[in-house]
Amino acid sequence: MRTQVMQCCCLTAVALFLFCSMPLLAQRQDILLNNNWKFRFSHQVQKGSEVRVDLPHTWNAQDALSGKIDYKRGIGNYEKKLFIRPEWQGKRLFLRFEGANSIADVFINRRHIGEHRGGYGAFVFEITGEVDYGKENSIWVRVNNGEQLDVMPLVGDFNFYGGIYRDVHLLITDEVCISPLNYASPGIRLIQDSVSRQYAKVRAVVDLANGNNAGQEAELSIRLLDGEKVVAEQKQKLSLAGKSSVQQELTFEINNPHLWNGRQDPFLYRAEVSLWKGGQLADCVTQPLGLRYYRIDPDKGFFLNGKHLPLQGVCRHQDRSEVGNALRPQHHEEDAALMLEMGVNAVRLAHYPQATYFYNLMDKNGIIVWAEIPFIGPGGYDDKGFVDLPSFRANGKEQLKELIRQHYNHPSICVWGLFNELLESGDNPVEYIKELNELAHQEDATRPTTSASNQMGELNFITDAIAWNRYDGWYGGTPADLGRWLDAMHRDHPEIRIAISEYGAGASIYHQQDSLVKTVPTSWWHPENWQTYYHIENWKTISSRPYVWGSFVWNMFDFGAAHRTEGDRPGVNDKGLVTFDRKVRKDAFYFYKANWNKQEPMLYLAGKRNIMRSQQLQTIIAFTNQPEAELFVNGKSWGKVKADPYAILEWKNVELQPGENEIKVVSGNKKIPLVDSFHCRF
């Protein structure tokens, strides 16, 4: 009898889970509206000038990516016809845009319903009272990526692609629902008040809305699920006044929680929040919950769940060749896979909020995230990143609220970034940064703030941690300068938490040289071997200083920058470890893979694209995470060499023969034989 009861309980729990997880049964529908839009520029007013496009879409996939400095920055119009079913009357309808750059005005049946100013956050408008039920309706979106003085960012060393470049959704809910209108957040904020290995206390703050004129009696419940097992559950009855929006809190506790532990164990609970009305399920939203605790020590660096974790990171711009910023899921997945292959455990998503899909991938794979707003200074260019206008200040605060509220529940996010390379001249941003820092703490008391600086000044002492963009050995100086600078900074300011937010050098896979000669960064010659040398020397410096809480290679991927005229082509910043099309991993990628990815045995010969050698005596370099390897040149052994502490193998004065040569390296591990080779001519 007991077995039957247990089986019945299990079946009931599974049925309830399925009931709450299926959008139709849960009274919430999420309909993707990406297909069959008509697009035209603002000057194309003649009928028939539209072209059919599917979203995500940018109108700069050709001009900006070809290095055209004056790529189109203006107004594009998107229109879609949508049949609104008669049975949706009595429901609530919302349009959710994941991203449109940078100003979007939305019209329903040619009536203006709202404007969003900012190109990287999601936004939601309710259209319940604007549509005609049982008829075809028009959705018209006017997008403007032109320069504005009151919308962040004002400047940037990257392309400002125009368009609706992320997904668009139609959300259909009951009149009583978990509201999507709180800065386009999921309507649930999971606040980790206390987390340890023994105990966790979490508050769920839920945004509720009643669209009916009459008051409603309801019940709010939350279940924390580990697979299909209910770990914690809370319920609360409530009364919602007519036409009201309220926040409700539910608190739950967990003993001996399973922690989210980065790459080692990125475990996620599911927090399932349900709203019941008259005994019927009115709405249900599920969010990830990764329980973790962490700190940044000014002397010892970053600690996750009580254990030291050096953050071996990269920066990521969201664009790629041919598609610009209009990425599909497979593009995000490929980027994440390349990062995982290299052994990355942290990423700075620069210089703006990126797609929710990518944050989800970081949660699932245990990669720690630095997320930031697009408050960007001019860097090495003659421009301004801050204007002291009330409208600009307000826009920055709105974008910060969007970032935090939309992405609060992602356990991968551990720091909020507030600015990049600002100047304390002209309109001085220091007081405004203090306001942003205070706002970030008001919005989220659980995460520290940080920023990326490139100069000394008061702005470096505002956020909880600070990082610097350093290019020692690329934009002047030598790689050895980084160590001297870090040590002096730590000595003079032992209280601050120091990271390296950017370091990198340009490289073309088509530019090869025998000798190691530093180039001019702004020239058309970006030899790959200098990038490799740069990263080897900089990583030696960073990895030997535990007080550096994180370091972020600039950049994981080449990215579009239409104004750049350097490297092997205009319009591309080639500091990536992987090419713009994601097809080629540069030599420096494999250097980091050998150092950071100890799980996947690897052996790689550097310089294999240098197929025309000018000198008979060569230095052959390989990277491996194995103890040693043996070099063969034209079948002759040049001996076994043990890998140094930085996973480097080096054979000096290796003699080539005139004509064709085969260079081959073989791992000494017989259980896992590894071989890499290439051919070159002398």
What are these model-derived regions, one by one?
Residues M1-L18, L24-H351, L361, G366-V369, ...:
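Secreted/periplasmic carbohydrate-active enzymes, especially glycoside hydrolases
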Residues A100-E175, T519-Y592, N597:
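Long, contiguous interaction/targeting segments characteristic
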Residues E333-M339, A346-V584, A588-Y592, M602-S614, ...:
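Substrate-binding/catalytic cleft of secreted carbohydrate-active enzymes
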